[in-house]
Design a protein with these regions (language model features):
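Catalytic cores of phosphodiester-bond hydrolases, prominently lipid phosphodiesterases
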Residues: 1-114, 149-386
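Asp/Glu-centered strand-loop micro-motifs enriched in Gly/Pro and often flanked by an aromatic residue
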Residues: 118-123
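Short alpha-helical segments and helix-capping/turn motifs at coil-helix boundaries
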Residues: 124-127, 237-239
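Aromatic/hydrophobic pocket-lining residues that form π-stacking "cages" and hydrophobic walls in ligand
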Residues: 128, 138, 334
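Non-catalytic positions within long, well-ordered alpha-helices that form the structural scaffold/packing
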Residues: 133-134, 366
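Short acidic, Gly/Ser-rich segments with clustered Asp/Glu that frequently serve as metal-coordination loops
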Residues: 139-151
Length: 386
């Protein structure tokens, strides 16, 4: 009878993995059932732990990736860049040799490739001139002030920013003389006599534009600017025009601000300061084909000017998302007129924020034919081609 009972129980309940033993006591049967149930619970628990661990790990990795993407977008949006002055951490410190501006590091220019950018308000940078050169800018800007009977030209954005030691000589002329002298050495292997290697070792023929923005009376200040440039002129390092022929040199000086155009033109045989022409006045309809004919000589041309510049915000207007067709037509007409006269186009006071809009405007200007970017953010302007 026990055999029939065993078979009947086996057919009714096969939920347990352990074979039913008819000879076990009731307590032993309960203990066996509890062990089987515990085994199943352990298996479920291990599976739950594995599933939860996988989900938590995947969530953590996803959040980490998401944070990295958001961080990159924020850096791009806000224009967070590396500091180009980081190599000058010892500048001006005791024992560095820079206390009196007697030492200038030229080694940092050996691997620098020139980039068509202009360092706007360059004197605001931690290391004027050198910060711009380090990233490859081919133009720097200095605002100069003349006071009373002094012959010194002080450099700064306004009167409150001027100091006795920040002058055109100390910040620009003397450092440029030192850099170019080192790039034109007198050695048994190289005779620097009559050579004109510029500041960039990778492109020694590239001229550096020194844009001098005269802030005080032009008629009184311009003669002092000419006098302050004598160390460069005496070494034949200033681009000049003589008898109608332009001679390119390592430094090209351009006068802007209150620079008097009529005074620059007084010497018809020799000039080594060029004018920053008013770009807005050079507009020509971009939709009219250029026949190449010109019945009258241009007032502003390559013999007296280099740049043709304008305040972007005033000449073109505000930009919200993209440049309008009307704004593009203005830009094309101004660029057409400047290039027809052999001048380089420079827009200043372009929108600086948000960075996405700024970059789009930079790209559009260069695509339309602008020759140089007028920038405050050196790293962003030189990290890619526009």
């Amino acid at each position: 009878m026990w055999l029939e009972k065993y078979r009947r129980n086996r057919s009714i309940d096969e939920t347990s993995d352990d074979s039913y033993e008819p000879f076990l006591s009731a307590s032993e049967l309960e203990e066996a059932d509890e062990k089987a149930l515990g085994t199943k619970r352990n298996r479920r628990r291990r599976f739950s732990y594995f599933t939860c661990g996988t989900l938590w790990g995947s969530t953590f990795l996803f959040l980490l990736l998401l944070f990295s993407i958001i961080f990159s977008i924020v850096r791009s949006f806000w224009g967070v860049e590396e500091d180009p002055d980081s190599i000058f951490t010892g500048w001006g410190k005791d024992g560095s040799g820079t206390e009196s501006l007697a030492w200038y590091p030229t080694d940092f220019l050996r691997d620098v490739t020139p980039v068509p950018c202009h360092s706007h308000n360059d004197y605001w940078r931690r290391i004027p001139l050198f910060s711009a050169l380090r990233v490859g800018c081919v133009g720097v800007e200095a605002d100069v002030w003349l006071f009373g009977n002094s012959s010194e030209l002080y450099v700064g954005h306004d009167r409150a920013a001027l100091t006795p030691h920040r002058t055109l000589q100390s910040l620009y002329v003397n450092p440029l003389v030192d850099i170019i002298e080192r790039n034109n050495p007198q050695t048994p292997f190289y005779n620097s006599s009559g050579t004109h290697r510029g500041v960039f070792d990778t492109d020694p023929d590239q001229t550096l534009v020194l844009l001098i923005d005269i802030k005080t009376d032009g008629a009184k200040t311009l003669p002092q600017v000419e006098a302050q440039l004598e160390p460069l002129r005496a070494r034949d390092w200033l681009t000049y025009i003589k008898d109608g022929v332009i001679h390119e040199r390592p430094i090209t000086v351009v006068g802007t601000g209150r620079t008097p155009f009529d005074m620059l033109m007084q010497n018809s045989t020799y000039r080594d300061i060029f004018f920053d022409a008013p770009l807005k006045e050079l507009y020509e309809d971009p939709n009219i084909p250029d026949t190449g004919e010109n019945n009258e000589p241009y007032v502003y041309n390559r013999t007296n000017s280099l740049y043709a510049s304008v305040n972007f915000r005033r000449a073109i207007g505000s930009v919200w998302t993209d440049l309008s067709e009307g704004q593009l037509r203005l830009i094309r007409g101004q660029i057409k007129g400047a290039h027809k006269r052999g001048l380089k186009v420079r827009y200043w006071n372009t929108p600086a924020w948000p960075v996405i809009r700024r970059n789009k405007i930079w790209h559009t200007l260069m695509a339309e034919g602008a020759d140089i970017l007028n920038v405050d953010d050196l790293k962003a302007a030189t990290r890619k081609r526009w």
